[in-house]
Design a protein with these regions (language model features):
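Membrane-interfacial helix-loop segments of redox and metal-homeostasis proteins
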Residues: 2-189
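Conserved redox-active cysteine motifs that mediate thiol-disulfide chemistry
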Residues: 49, 57, 127-129, 237-251
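Functionally engaged cysteine thiol sites
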Residues: 49-54, 58, 129, 275-278, ...
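Short pre-active-site segment immediately N-terminal to redox-active cysteine/selenocysteine motifs
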Residues: 73, 125, 238-241, 367
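C-terminal cap of thioredoxin/glutaredoxin-like
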Residues: 150, 253-256, 323-418
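Membrane-interface segments at or immediately adjacent to transmembrane helices
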Residues: 181-229, 235
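Catalytic His-Asp charge-relay segment
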Residues: 233-235, 370-371
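Structural alpha/beta surface segment adjacent to cysteine/selenocysteine redox centers
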Residues: 235-238, 246-328, 361-363, 405-418
Length: 418
């Protein structure tokens, strides 16, 4: 006679099923939390930056096209699945088990799709997502080995006999949660105006660290001949293989159009690759030194190469692609050219000039992107609305100061005029 409790009442499979459910819940919670922190930081100190590795990077996932569905972070659906699996282990029943087996089958299919998308399209893996994948596969394997219908040995009997009542109940609860999640997401997005004002205030309160002793001659935006003459002066310590640097580049592409003629952006090479950067303890982004040399080889073509690298972000990790890039731009000698290496090294070394911001790191510049905006340092990047607010404040300050200088007349001059 076939038993009717979860995973045939076997103790360890049932405990493991509970652990897999709780694991999916925990991983989903941190995924959702990171999604909102990355996309809607509450303060200037929560900006996203790269200092883990090129592959294991959660920001790439948080900024991707599939991070949300109609405003719902996909981690929410993982949270629901994990909750159902954990509850099924605590309150076992034949119907609950068959329903969870069906859900676990669909869940593992989704995991496969997301894994393929992350690895082959994004070229990275979020550690929180990886944790969810592991627990999801564990749950599926447990239902496969110990679930109902094992004596029949057929896929249909194991995974395609859910309880319609439980499915409907789960769908209703999920729908209520979806509504709440959408409302919360909208509230976070709508609150960005108020957050932007707070960001501007926090930016003003940052200590003035000043510009580096050597400002890179490689500018992505030039509004004035002299760097300090623009209302917005941005020095961008960046790595061509950093996903957060890609995000910042996309933000700046929008902002440079809106603030045309008012912004200078100097690209300060800072590859997180120990081949050319002594600050980096290990090769976080192998190949980024090569890309820096290629981009720096011919200053006249820097912007072209810069844009092409970021437009082919995933391909840029491939050594063959980098060789072809160098060939097309006539920069085959870049990797051995002492002049190119010297200027890139000079730019990198300016990162050592800043006082360290954490006891964990020896220098102030230690991750990418790091921005020096009008002499103030921001580690990481910020959402478009917040960056725009900071830029607008700088422009208004500059124009107000300019107007004051133009219309201000000394007291003695006014007396003479009378």
């Amino acid at each position: 006679m076939e038993r009717t409790s979860t995973l045939n009442s076997l103790r360890w499979p049932r405990i493991l099923s509970f652990i897999s459910g709780m694991g999916m819940m925990a991983a989903s919670f941190f995924t959702i939390r990171h999604f909102f922190i990355a996309n809607y930081p509450d303060n200037i100190f929560e900006g996203s930056f790269c200092d883990i590795s090129a592959f294991f990077n959660c920001d790439n996932s948080a900024f991707s096209a599939i991070a949300q569905i109609m405003g719902i972070p996909i981690g929410y659906f993982g949270l629901i699945v994990g909750t159902l699996v954990a509850l099924g282990a605590v309150f076992p029943s034949d119907k609950f088990e068959r329903t969870n087996a069906f859900i676990s089958f669909l869940n593992v299919l989704g995991v496969i799709v997301l894994f393929v998308y992350s690895v082959f399209f994004l070229g990275s893996m979020c550690l929180f997502c990886a944790g969810f994948y592991i627990f999801a596969v564990l749950s599926f394997v447990l239902f496969w080995l110990y679930g109902k219908g094992q004596d029949k040995g057929r896929l249909f009997s194991k995974f395609f006999q859910p309880s319609l009542k439980i499915l409907v109940a789960a769908a209703c609860i999920t729908a209520l949660g979806v509504y709440g999640m959408i409302q919360y997401h909208d509230a976070r997005r709508d609150a960005q105006a108020a957050v932007a004002l707070r960001i501007v205030k926090q930016f003003r309160e940052l200590p003035v660290v000043g510009n580096p002793s050597f400002i890179s001659p490689y500018w992505t935006v030039r509004s004035t001949d002299n760097f300090e003459d623009a209302p917005i002066q941005l020095i961008e310590y960046s790595d061509f293989l950093c996903s957060d640097c890609l995000f910042l580049t996309q933000q700046l592409d929008r902002l440079k159009e809106e603030f045309a003629g008012k912004i200078n952006i100097a690209f300060q090479f800072f590859p997180l690759d120990s081949q050319c950067n002594a600050v980096v303890e290990k090769n976080l982004y192998p190949g980024s030194c090569e890309l820096s040399y290629i981009a720096a080889y011919d200053p006249a073509r820097f912007i072209e190469i810069h844009d092409e690298i970021f437009a082919n972000f995933n391909n840029a990790r491939n050594p063959e692609w980098r060789q072809e890039l160098a060939r097309r731009y006539g920069a085959e000698e870049a990797l051995s050219d002492p002049v190119t290496q010297d200027i890139v090294q000079t730019i990198i070394n300016t990162g050592m000039e800043y006082v360290k911001t954490s006891d964990r790191y020896a220098y102030g510049i230690r991750s990418t992107p790091t921005m020096i905006i009008n002499g103030r340092m921001i580690i990481g990047t910020l959402p478009y609305e917040q960056m725009r607010a900071v830029f607008q404040d700088l422009v208004e300050e500059f124009e107000g100061r300019k107007e004051f200088i133009e219309y201000w007349v000394p007291q003695k001059a006014r007396e003479v005029k009378r």
